[in-house]
Amino acid sequence: MRLSRAFAWPLLCSIATTVKAPFATAPSDCGGHYTDEYGRIFNYAGPKTECVWIIELNPGEIVTVAIPDLKGFACGKEYVEVLDGPPGSESLDRICKAFSTFYYSSSNIITIKYSREPSHPPTFFEIYYFVDAWSTH
């Protein structure tokens, strides 16, 4: 589920200022399986062209993904995809441009995939994830 931008921007600002490090991921990670209640995913600048991050919270919890800004992405050469569940699940969105966008999982798992063409250098991005305290099953 995608949240409207009018509501998302103030919420993201409040989250970004109240949720501070330590975050679960590091800029050099190309994928991984994370179980922390919140974290931040950075772009990967190494030779791999596809990275997959699986975020798995406790059963009954909903994962919220916040993408503050994707700018500078070359659409057609790189994108971020948000999957509603483990790899292979339904895609919530495949994006190459975004500003203040939120996604919610329908279960306790969400997958973030970054893909780029081998000849294209990676563009900086950061994505936040956290447990949605208001939307548990």
From Swiss-Prot:
Coiled coil spans: none
Organism placement in taxonomy: Eukaryota, Metazoa, Chordata, Craniata, Vertebrata
Keywords: Disulfide bond, Signal
InterPro entries cross-referenced by the UniProt entry: CUB_dom, Sperma_CUB_dom_sf
Disulfide bridge positions per record: 30-51, 75-96
Domain CUB: 30-132
Annotated protein name in UniProt: CUB domain-containing protein
Keyword Signal: yes
Signal peptide: 1-21
